[in-house]
Amino acid sequence: MDFVDLIEEKRFLGQEFLTWLWWKSEERGGSVALPGYGDISLVFEKHMLLEFGEGESAEKLICSGLKAELQEARTGLQVGKKLEHARIRMTKGDNEYSFTLVASLMEFRNIRLPKTAMTETEESGNREDMEGMILERIYLFEELLQTVNALFRSFLDVRLDQDWSPELAKIRSWISTTPLHNPS
């Protein structure tokens, strides 16, 4: 088995993680308890991509709009489509991040880091200020990655435990509570 086949075989894990994360974000009104980090806020917004099938028979469903309009994406889950891309806004403390997460490769796209006093000031040309700004941005990237990694670890703890069956039942119930979307 080559590397590409291995990625394809394991992509379901990222799709399950993204679906679990979406459910967790709605379970407590956007607040997710993360051990060691406290509560963080997660909002799935604007853009989702769902997939079904493989090869030439693959179908893609792109859902975009306001949070309320993402009902079509939940309807897609009901008919067996898998969440592949999602735009997420995450708030941890005073820092608000926005990014797209691609499930199959756990790839980040279109990352927006929080605005800080350092990044909002006019460029002074001062080397120390520039170095400070770069270090601050590196810190913010690391904070984002560490937080998403902690969320993934939390998911794996449940997914690989006997607690997965009750959790899966809750997720299925959440998916099925959405009325099937019939566009007029």
Model feature map: region roles:
Residues 1-184:
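Intrinsically disordered, low-complexity, charge-rich terminal extensions
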